[in-house]
């Protein structure tokens, strides 16, 4: 019994440790969004719905069948035969079928089969937004982890200052003012740790939701990141028309509008039909029939107004969508160039912090720490050196955060997934 309990406890600990140690890369998060987010299923079902509806595009009008009396007198006595005089009236069975114009069927079929193409591009456009939202949360999580590393180091440094100051104060070698500043700073560090840890939990919840999973599933992330170089990229109409799904959906919508125009034009073509009537006479009358060919003439002036108005309306709708495309491309191009300029600036600032500012301040702190340990420097000077270093380290991480946000915005604009 004890052995079984030990095995179960060991198994539970292994499962718990494996669930807590799950580390996801950004690519894995993106793949989960593409496969599991509810919006994907919504669009897939909508696309399937349109494709199923398109299967009925070549349907004919239903046949019409009727039965009733034909040329029958109200006087029932006249229905019957009187000697050599046959009765009057008959029962008529009637059937009618209109044959659709082949060109109209072709136009309807092309239009209905193209309807889902717009939704497919809208699905990709929505996925682009979701994926870049995930990138933003992912990079913000990386930044928070970097800040926690800085805070952990700050906690260690401040605890060293406090303990050392307490010893020196007891020996009459230290002033108490800087000691309290260090104590307060340690409290601030712990407060910031709590806030950043809460922010990380929030990012985890948001990413779980985007991946279509239980929001409370525990996982960690791979903190590898790359600042991309877009200096050689030309943000012109060719790039956006090639990449952006919302512009592709507008192209599909223009094509759909043109196909709808074709259906309206095809509706102006004549339709032919046939009508057959069979009469079964009363009182010895012979059976008779009528067969007629029929034609509908929708191109007549008084019956074609609606179709012609729709054709003209669709033409102007096409112009409106084309203008919308040009407006969007112009906006995207301006935004992308502006964001790239900001990103280049942030990269230069980050390089300055990495190569000059932070190394110099770290060396300054180490020098102050060495002097403090050798009793040649005061605690407040060591504290000031640490405070300056800490401020610049956090500024550096904030710069990195801004650079990653700009990168995500550019990738959202050019739809780089």
Language-model-detected regions and their locations in the chain:
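Bacterial Sec-dependent N-terminal signal peptides
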Residues: 1-27, 32-34, 410, 414-417
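Sec/SRP-type N-terminal targeting helices
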Residues: 41-45, 58, 99-127, 177, ...
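Periplasmic alpha-helical coiled-coil/stalk elements that build and connect Gram-negative outer-membrane
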Residues: 129-243, 339-346, 389
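A small-residue-enriched
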Residues: 31-100, 239-312, 334, 412
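Sec-dependent signal peptide cleavage junction
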Residues: 18-48, 201, 216, 226, ...
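Short segments within alpha-helical structural elements
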Residues: 188-213, 360-416
